Amino acid sequence: MTKYNNKAPPSPAVLRGVSVVSVAASPSSFSLPHNLCLRRHCRSLEYDFSFLKPLYKVERERNHPKQGPSSDFQGLRFSFSTMAILGLIKRVTRITVNNSRVRVYPVRYFQSKDLSSTNLFNGEDAAKLPVLIVGAGPVGLVLSILLTKLGVKCAVVDKATSFSKHPQAHFINNRSMEIFRELDGLAEEIERSQPPVDLWRKFIYCTSLSGSTLGTVDHMQPQDFEKVVSPASVAHFSQYKLTNLLLKRLEDLGFHVRGSKESDGLEADSVVARQILMGHECVGIDANKDSITATVSFLKGGKHMKRNIQCSLLVGADGAGSAVRKLTEIEMRGERDLQKLVSVHFMSRELGEYLISNRPGMLFFIFNTDGIGVLVAHDLLQGEFVLQIPYYPPQQSLSDFSPEMCKMLIFNLVGHELSDLDVADIKPWVMHAEVAEKFMCCENRVILAGDAAHRFPPAGGFGMNTGIQDAHNLAWKIAALVQGSANSSILKTYETERRPIALSNTSLSVQNFRAAMSVPSALGLDPTVANSVHRFINKTVGSILPTGLQKAILDNVFALGRAQLSESLLNESNPLGNQRLSRLKSIFEGGKSLQLQFPAEDLGFRYLEGAIVPDNESEAGDPEVPSGRRRDYVPCAEPGSRLPHMYVKILSDSTREVIVSTLDLVSTEKVEFLLIISPLQESYELAHATFKVAKEFMASVKVCVVWPSSDDGLERKSNSALAPWENYVDVMEVKKQNGEGTSWWSICKMSERGSILVRPDQHIAWRAKSGITLDPTLHMRDVFTIILGKQ
């Protein structure tokens, strides 16, 4: 791989109290208090920019001819005549002073090109494809949908020749379901297609599926179904089924799935947008100052062929063994090889019907003298299951898990034979807890997302969900860059925001995995003992023993451990068995076993820095360290947080009652910010300023005016207060049928004089808890400058 160094000229920055931050919309808007002495500031400017070539002058007389020249202004004119910024600033159109900060607004500042010598999407030199996504899993497909809906052209390549039918991930948390609500009814279709919640709300611990029950944990609470904190519920839906629904939406957007043979018609060194090329493996990445060239390998007529694909950005969403990550030499950091397992995918409607009638659940933890395993019931109605079995290579090999051997193990764990058992797939996998040292490289042109950037234990279901949220965070930033409202530095905020979340979710997943191990430990099956024996055999004197003897030692150790699960020992009449069963009961009742839902982390994660404007009243420091226990979500409106959910009524539709979530007010079809205010004069003034500034930045903004709930029949419209601007919506708080309910601003813990600016990904970019005291136009210009990376 060839990395490039593209040294950009110094970007405008605060220098000795002076900041060059934005551009005025009109030359006539030049203003400066003529009685304000700026000689000291001018000397600072002259000193700080003395290395720049003089290119222009600022003439106060043009805008204040009656006042004539002043000595103060002469000094200012001389200082600004030295400010060329290496030729990037052609003309100054406004100078303002606010809180002793001199602001110079050059004409080109609001133009789409970055303040750097190279722009990612610069006209004639633009790459043929704006974005290439490597990996056609849920993360890559969701990203391609989001980008396409936002108007960004992209294509997808994947080394697999077909889409996997292995169920893999299956738990979809609240935040991911909220994102799926944006994808043309995907969340609703998942809710309709998934098994009924009563068939998967529990984890069951037993000696066999037809034997004694050691414990049952119900992971659903009443509030989980009331949609108080989220408009979406969690779901249990296999990954391959989700993939099918995502492909359906991509087809509706004009995408075509092609194999290596079907891609023959494409140009040799290009890929047109809206293509999903299967059987195309990324084998090389070459970066230069203008673009990325990905080399993909594919089979054609039995021969390995290669195709070069030129793009502006490349997103590696190609899973835990990411080729993109390896090609760019990005290291993973964390715990490796927590556990090796074999995953057995099988079908049995007979077993599904039995469990529906006797003990429905999502996960079954089975411990007996013949075997140990975790059974994932992906769909009891269809009889689809995956059995996870501990695996200890090299003493054990995949050949030890033949279909016949797996059938025997399944019968032992079920407690009886099944007449319709069909083993569909057997595959080994390794559990890691790692996060990439960085999510971006090659001047932010190569980006990692999903499992390519972080690998978690499956405990808690954070793997796919974190990846879906990666895509949601990244899509609007790429679109803002492509469409010209943001600078390329906005892409760096993807890593700044998402990597800390990945680290937190890694910690939480490990905590949850340790909690899962507490149950076998209580039964006398300490997993650390098995791992220690395995390490001893592989790394010490045991490694010189014949392979057959090594395997025999390992098998005997495991058999000895499982002997503690015999019915004669594990019962209340046996003192040791009674003690162990009492410990189990304590673990289950105390909520110390494996958990399924984590509302606080699912909905309450917050970006502490990035494309946000922190305020002085936000909680500082690192977020609370995950405990591995369920904590309820508490709504928060601090910058970086997800916008709180509340149902509101759209007042502009007089023909019918339209009730939506506050999350639904954020556009899914374009990069648009949402300003939420109250119907107050000062808030309307802020809205006018925000509209004006957004136009300068070539950004879109919509204003939402939240009216308090009332039945007085008075008209609630903001058209006259917001004219001539038209992109606004009036909404009214919806109270419960009994009249109870909390106001919007109370939920946000803010005054009604406050305001909230929401990003296109439904996270809060900025807020004012109780109004702003500064010039609203200047203030919002600073806000958009920070969010869009134009500092």
Over which residues does each language-model region extend?
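C-terminal helical "tail/cap" subdomain of flavin- and related membrane-associated enzymes
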Residues: 4, 97, 101, 479-638, ...
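N-terminal Rossmann-like FAD-binding beta1-loop-alpha1 element of flavoenzymes
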Residues: 124-156
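Conserved mid-domain beta->alpha element of the FAD-binding
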Residues: 136-144, 246, 316, 423, ...
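Active-site-adjacent segment of FAD-dependent monooxygenases/related oxidoreductases
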Residues: 165-252, 256-267, 367-368
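Conserved FAD/dinucleotide-binding core of flavoprotein oxidoreductases
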Residues: 207-239, 298-300, 304-308, 356, ...
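Active-site substrate-recognition segment that forms the wall
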Residues: 213-218, 340, 344, 358-394, ...
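A conserved short coil-to-beta-strand element within the FAD-binding core of flavoproteins
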Residues: 259-292
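Short hydrophobic core segments
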Residues: 309-319
